[in-house]
Structure formats: structure tokens, C-alpha cells
A protein has these predicted regions:
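Short amphipathic alpha-helices and their capping/turn segments at secondary-structure boundaries
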Residues: 20-23, 96-107, 136-153
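Short, acidic/polar
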Residues: 11-24
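Mobile, glycine- and charge-enriched loop segments
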Residues: 1-13
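Metal-dependent phosphoesterases centered on the DNase I-like endonuclease/exonuclease/phosphatase
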Residues: 49-51, 133-234
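Active-site metal-binding loops of divalent metal-dependent hydrolases
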Residues: 7, 35, 161
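Structured beta-strand-rich core segments of catalytic domains in phosphoester-bond hydrolases
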Residues: 35-36, 41-125
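Short catalytic/ligand-binding loop motif for oxyanion handling, primarily in non-cytosolic enzymes
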Residues: 11, 39-41, 61-62, 120-123, ...
Length: 235
């Protein structure tokens, strides 16, 4: 079982009982975003039951991604790729990590990617950073598809994309569409293009043509209670 989660800080998650939840789950491979901690601290928190690789952000206290595998069930193969490409800037660091894993006894390995896209903010430099990042992600996604075709190693890209794909992925579409980052047509087009190119939206495939399921809710008001959420996390 592969589980992807935005930790909103691994130290804060640890204090809230993250490891107890993880140990009780069937997770074999844990894909993490917003780790927001140095590699040494993150590895120490995960403990001896998990092997892990990390791509921390070069800006202290921001971003950071990781992949952990449960010892005795899954192992890593080769060296991880902790960058998206050679154009990675400090603000883009800690947002892309590739590693190959293999379940005990499995014939075929799996490339797992932990991705954390910029949240953005409409009409600000934050949005400019997001829109500069998305085409580069798309270029790497195309390379991964080509590599699978050539070498037979499938890829699973997981993470917090900070973009919905359609009206089904956000409770309040009309008041947000083209008004807030994450619901802009210029962002949505990238996700739908990747699906057209051959990637599968696993959550949507499993859920079907329904509203939701959501993966993020605002802290404001009663968003969680009213299930007024967004689906911005993908596998």
C-alpha cells in the first residue's frame, strides 16, 4: 500500500500522533510533502521501522519531500533523484523526489515520486513561480512515461499539486474559479494535459464521476464539518 500525505511539518505531525496512525495502517510506502525539517530530524522521527530518503528545501522551514519504506517489506534500489531538473532554484527545492522501490518478492520495481507544487497566489510573484514550475514538471512527466516505455519501470507520482482538475474537485467552484490560485484555468490545463498524455488520476478512477473526495479543507469556518473541501492531492 502506498500512502501520500502532506504533513504540514513532520515535527508537528509527530506531536499529534502521526506515527501511531502510520503504524496502525497498512502502509508499505509513505510519500510525504511539506516535511519542513532537516533530513537528520525527519529520519530520526521515522524511527528504526522505516528506511527513508529525503529532499529538504534549501530555505529553512519550507517545503521538503520524502519517501519512506517499511523495513522487511519494501526496499530502495539505486540512488534517489532529489531534484526536478538542473534549473531548480532555492524556492523550487524540496518539491520533487524520485526513488525506485521494490516489494519483497516482486519482479518489477516501481519508481515513486513525491511532488509538492507551489501553492501560488493570483497576480503575485508566488503565482509566477508556480507557473514557471508547472511546465518543467510536465517535461519530467513526459520523460518518465518514455522511460517506462523503454525500460518497463512504471512510475507513481504522488503529492500535493495545489490544483484542482474540475468542478468535481472543489465544493465551491463558482466563487473560486479563476479567482483563486489552485482553481485557475492556466493551472488546470496542465493536469488535464498530463492525463491526456497517458497518466492516470488514480483517485478519480477509483471514486468515479462523483463530487469529491476532497483532501484539503480550510481552517476557517466549518469547512471540514460541512465537507467544503478541495481535492488537490493526487496519486
Amino acid at each position: 500500500t502506498v500512502t501520500t500525505v502532506n504533513l504540514n511539518g513532520i515535527r508537528a505531525a509527530h506531536k499529534r500522533g502521526f506515527l501511531a496512525w502510520l503504524d496502525a495502517s497498512a502502509t508499505d510506502v509513505l510519500v510525504m510533502q511539506e516535511v519542513r525539517a532537516p533530513e537528520e530530524i525527519a529520519r530520526d522521527i521515522m524511527g528504526e521501522a522505516w528506511d527513508s530518503v529525503w529532499a529538504p528545501c534549501r530555505i529553512k522551514g519550507r517545503a521538503g519531500v520524502g519517501v519512506a519504506v517499511r523495513r522487511g517489506r519494501v526496499g530502495f534500489e539505486g540512488e534517489p533523484r532529489p531534484v526536478l531538473d538542473d534549473a531548480e532554484t532555492d524556492v523550487d527545492s524540496g518539491r520533487w523526489l524520485e526513488t525506485v522501490v521494490r516489494r519483497e518478492g516482486a519482479q518489477t520495481p516501481l519508481r515513486v515520486v513525491s511532488a509538492y507544487f507551489h501553492s501560488g497566489e493570483k497576480d503575485t510573484p508566488k503565482q509566477e513561480a508556480k507557473m514557471a514550475h508547472l511546465p518543467r514538471v510536465g517535461a519530467r512527466m513526459a520523460e518518465l512515461l518514455a522511460d517506462e516505455e523503454e525500460n518497463g519501470v512504471p512510475s507513481l507520482v504522488c503529492g500535493d499539486f495545489n490544483v484542482v482538475r474540475s468542478e468535481a474537485d472543489i465544493k465551491n467552484w463558482k466563487p473560486n474559479h479563476n479567482k483563486r490560485a489552485g482553481v485557475l484555468d492556466e493551472e488546470i490545463v496542465f493536469l488535464n494535459r498530463w492525463v491526456e498524455e497517458g497518466w492516470r488520476d488514480t483517485v478519480r478512477d477509483l471514486a468515479g464521476d462523483v463530487q469529491g473526495p476532497y483532501s484539503w479543507w480550510s481552517w476557517r469556518g466549518q469547512a471540514f464539518v460541512n465537507n467544503a473541501g478541495w481535492r488537490i492531492d493526487y496519486q
